[in-house]
From Swiss-Prot:
Reactions that this protein is recorded to catalyse: 2-(N(omega)-L-arginino)succinate = fumarate + L-arginine
GO biological process: arginine biosynthetic process via ornithine; L-arginine biosynthetic process
Family: Belongs to the lyase 1 family. Argininosuccinate lyase subfamily.
Transmembrane segments: none
Protein name (record): Argininosuccinate lyase
MF-aspect GO terms: argininosuccinate lyase activity
Pfam family, one: ASL_C2
Organism: Gloeothece citriformis (strain PCC 7424) (Cyanothece sp. (strain PCC 7424))
PROSITE patterns membership: FUMARATE_LYASES (PS00163)
Top-level lineage group: Bacteria
Length: 462
């Protein structure tokens, strides 16, 4: 590393090569280059707007910065590790292009407020992209729900069959988890979209800058009212990684169900060849690698959140070099969430097929209608707890006899309690069990159809 550092005139000796490499961030903060250029263009225009530099100089700066953007997009600008970070790399290249005027760009600005601006612009953009991905994920869930209102699936508690539900109802649960994710990111976007530009190193600047003008150019909704907070705040990054962790929780839960449902033991879905892999030694295998990877990557995002929390907990005001470590955690968190949302959306849209015959068989081969027998008696005046205890005994007796509730004769029902009539068979039929749960938010078919309309409205309104 022989390049002269921007700050090196303060020092008599040169930086040890290993320390220079250790100190550099260009290998990962190059991710911010587009946002760094955008922020610098706004800063240059503000400097001219306030008379700190001339309009001609500002135009030279903007032209040079746009040239760097074009060079980067065309693969012609690839700063090496000797450049230390993306900010110095851009400034050095700008000076090469337009001469000494390029050295005026950093007037009234520190790397501290510069990187804070860059990372907010980056995250604002990424949040918008992720929210768009969430909408695509929700749409696929909604498409499946519309096709499976009256398809029944066992509902579980403690991973034991509990009550049958509409498959659409089950899928819409994930739709609403995703809706909360979408809304949560929108709230975080507001707190991210505040400009620290003009905070300087920590205390502001002596130049007559207009922070609100540059914020307006960058479409920020406001400016930090405290310069110390402006350069040292990373709440928005922590909030994002928290929201990202919740997105991953929801994707991981769905992934776990996909893994179970695709197993021979459940056999509720079939994985298509486009979204499954095989074994290197067992030729019969079709492995659910996509949901397994999503489930595995969830811990990775959790780790980034915890790492950033621990990073921040002991930092005094204002900027500290520790904050260089925020970027890799944030960048990888963003990349992981985007990749998992894309993979799950593809898996749902073209990677699975529901085995409706198997699902029908599943809801007809257990005692998940037992609660409805108790409800049947309670509706006819029998105290629910008494009815509950009675049905528990019936289930125990039926299990011992190798029978299901639907196999009992009417005489056997009446022996259990005289309130039973011939309509008990209809009451415990799986389709009726589901249809009868017509309370708001329940799995009844009428409620599910209304829930689908509500979900459509949510997607159309944003």
């Amino acid at each position: 590393m022989t390049e002269k550092k921007t700050w090196s005139d303060r020092f008599e000796g040169s930086l040890h090569p290993a320390i220079a490499y250790f100190n550099a961030s260009i290998e990962f903060d190059i991710e911010l280059i587009e946002y760094d250029l955008t922020g610098s263009i706004a800063h240059a225009k503000m400097l001219a707007h306030t008379g700190i530099i001339s309009e001609t100089e500002a135009q030279q700066l903007v032209t040079g910065l746009e040239q760097i953007r074009a060079e980067y997009r065309e693969g012609q600008f690839n700063p090496g590790i000797d450049q230390e970070d993306v900010h110095f790399a851009v400034e050095r290249r700008l000076t090469e292009i337009i001469g000494d005027v390029g050295k005026k760009l950093h007037t009234a600005r520190s790397r501290n407020d510069q990187v804070g601006t860059d990372i907010r612009l980056y995250l604002r953009d990424q949040i918008d992209q992720i929210r768009g991905q969430i909408r695509e994920f929700q749409q696929v869930l909604l498409d499946h729900a519309q096709n499976h209102v009256e398809t029944l699936i066992p509902g579980y508690t403690h991973l034991q069959r509990a009550q049958p539900v509409s498959l659409a109802h089950h899928l819409l649960a994930y739709f609403h988890m995703a809706q909360r994710d979408w809304e949560r990111l929108g709230e975080i976007r507001k707190r991210t979209n505040i400009s620290p530009l003009g905070s300087g190193a920590l205390a502001g600047t002596t130049f007559p800058i207009d922070r609100h003008y540059s914020a307006q150019l960058l479409q920020f909704e406001g400016v930090y009212p405290n310069s110390l907070d402006g350069v040292s705040d990373r709440d928005f990054a922590i909030e994002f990684l928290n929201a990202a962790s919740l997105i991953m929780v929801h994707l991981s839960r769905l992934s776990e169900e996909m893994i179970l449902w695709s197993s021979q033991e459940f056999s509720f879905i079939t994985l298509t060849d486009s979204c499954a892999t095989g074994s290197s030694i067992m030729p019969q295998k079709k492995n659910p690698d996509v949901p397994e990877l999503i489930r595995g990557k969830t811990g990775r995002v959790f780790g980034h959140l915890q790492g950033l929390l621990v990073l921040m907990k002991g930092l005094p005001l204002a900027y500290n070099k520790d904050l260089q470590e925020d970027k890799e955690a944030l960048f990888d968190g963003v990349k992981t969430v985007k990749g998992c949302l894309e993979a799950m959306t593809i898996l749902l849209s073209e990677g699975i097929k529901f085995k409706t015959e198997r699902l029908t068989q599943a809801v007809n081969e257990d005692f998940s209608n037992a609660t409805d027998v108790a409800d049947y008696l309670a509706a006819r005046g029998v105290p629910f707890r008494e009815a509950y205890n009675l049905v528990g005994k019936v289930v125990k007796t039926s299990l011992a006899a190798g029978k299901l509730l639907k196999d009992l004769t009417l005489d056997q029902w009446k022996e259990l309690h005289p309130a039973f009539e011939a309509d008990i068979y209809e009451a415990i039929a799986p389709s009726q069990v589901v249809a009868a749960r017509n309370s708001y938010g329940g799995t009844g078919f009428k409620q599910v159809r209304q829930a689908i309309l509500t979900a459509k409205t949510l997607l159309e309104s944003n």
